[in-house]
Amino acid sequence: MRQILFAAAIALTVSILLTPALIKFFAKQGFGQEIRVDGPASHQSKRGTPTMGGVAILIGMWAGYLGSHLIGIAYDAEGPSASALLVLGLATALGAVGFIDDFIKIRKGRNLGLTAAGKYLGQLTAAIVFGVLALQFRGENGLTPASRHLSYVRDITTVSMGVIVFLAFVSLVVVAWSNAVNLTDGLDGLAAGSMSLVLGGYVIITFWQYYHACATKPETGCYNVRDPLDLALVCAAGTAACIGFLWWNAAPAKIFMGDTGSLALGGLLAGLSITTRTELLMVVIGALFVAEAASVVLQVAVFRTTRNRLFKMAPFHHHFELSKWAETTVIIRFWLLAAMASAFGLGLFYSEYLSAVG
């Protein structure tokens, strides 16, 4: 428990102090956000706001995680684990893809960076490498960071995948979550605030899995998850890093996370869902991100079939803006939706445990 608090404290401190330094540096370098020309007119005033703030989130997460382990040496805590390093590595790899995308946008002075094919190639490469490595590193309890079963709150043993199908599934999960968070990052503080609520829920889930781990408590309802406590450190560091960044990203934003941050955070969710054996539960807890992505898919599908638009603009947070909701109203209400989804998901998680223990 102490390490979780240390991870959060360090990540929060690094993120909240590093972000203003990045604001000054990026502003000096002219690294400003380009705004989509077909977006809400009110967003044009945001043109030139420093972007790529996701760098602060990533550095904050790594600092919190590694710093908590350095402190843990004092009381003989276990060192970094394969599961946590793989999840952080996936987030960092996708953050690198986002950084390249952001940099191209800035250099070309337009809201178009990497081509769709180039972005998907980067996402798929990161996903496949993660998937391959996640089936390695068998721990003392015989568990690998990932399993080839589909999972809800724990593995669904009746649904097993071969290696190729598993890698395809991991690729789908990674691409879907990274793009979902990317689409949500369209209003000041929306993605960072929503992400802190989702990751906060996962701090509880991973700590519960640690407390009821089959490796230490082989009892009814225990969890077969490799390194749950270390994954809790990642979740705590991620939550705190997002909150620290949100201090400067809240409306009116002084900096945007850019694709650097949104792709990284989406990768973090994907990696956590796989390593904690909660792939289907993550859809519930991260329902806001799912809804944002679904709104884009529905908008395209309806337009192609009927030539009419389902929403005034997609992702659907823009629909509410164009319906005369103030930007801050949309943001706060969406945060509330994210909080409700996280709470509902935690309720499902706990109810499954109660059912398992009889």
UniProtKB/Swiss-Prot annotation:
Entry-linked InterPro entries: Glycosyl_transferase_4, PNAcMuramoyl-5peptid_Trfase, PNAcMuramoyl-5peptid_Trfase_CS
Enzyme class: transferase
KW Isomerase (keyword) present: no
Gene Ontology CC annotations of this record: plasma membrane
EC number: 2.7.8.13
GO annotation (BP), single: regulation of cell shape
Transmembrane residue ranges: 3-23, 54-74, 84-104, 114-134, 156-176, 187-207, 231-251, 255-275, 283-303, 330-350
PROSITE patterns to which the protein is assigned, alphabetical: MRAY_1, MRAY_2
Molecular functions (GO terms): metal ion binding; phospho-N-acetylmuramoyl-pentapeptide-transferase activity; UDP-N-acetylmuramoyl-L-alanyl-D-glutamyl-meso-2,6-diaminopimelyl-D-alanyl-D-alanine:undecaprenyl-phosphate transferase activity
Pathway: Cell wall biogenesis; peptidoglycan biosynthesis
Reaction(s) the record says it catalyses: UDP-N-acetyl-alpha-D-muramoyl-L-alanyl-gamma-D-glutamyl-meso-2,6-diaminopimeloyl-D-alanyl-D-alanine + di-trans,octa-cis-undecaprenyl phosphate = di-trans,octa-cis-undecaprenyl diphospho-N-acetyl-alpha-D-muramoyl-L-alanyl-D-glutamyl-meso-2,6-diaminopimeloyl-D-alanyl-D-alanine + UMP
Swiss-Prot/TrEMBL keywords: Cell cycle, Cell division, Cell membrane, Cell shape, Cell wall biogenesis/degradation, Magnesium, Membrane, Metal-binding, Peptidoglycan synthesis, Transferase, Transmembrane, Transmembrane helix
Places the protein is found: Cell membrane
Keyword Cell wall biogenesis/degradation found: yes
Membrane topology: Multi-pass membrane protein
Organism superkingdom: Bacteria
Names of the cofactor(s): Mg(2+)
UniProt-listed PANTHER family: PHOSPHO-N-ACETYLMURAMOYL-PENTAPEPTIDE-TRANSFERASE, PHOSPHO-N-ACETYLMURAMOYL-PENTAPEPTIDE-TRANSFERASE HOMOLOG
Family, similarity comment: Belongs to the glycosyltransferase 4 family. MraY subfamily.
Chain's role: Catalyzes the initial step of the lipid cycle reactions in the biosynthesis of the cell wall peptidoglycan: transfers peptidoglycan precursor phospho-MurNAc-pentapeptide from UDP-MurNAc-pentapeptide onto the lipid carrier undecaprenyl phosphate, yielding undecaprenyl-pyrophosphoryl-MurNAc-pentapeptide, known as lipid I.
Cited HAMAP family: MraY
Protein name: Phospho-N-acetylmuramoyl-pentapeptide-transferase
Species for this entry: Nocardia farcinica (strain IFM 10152)
Taxonomy of the source species: Bacteria, Bacillati, Actinomycetota, Actinomycetes, Mycobacteriales
Gene responsible for this protein: mraY
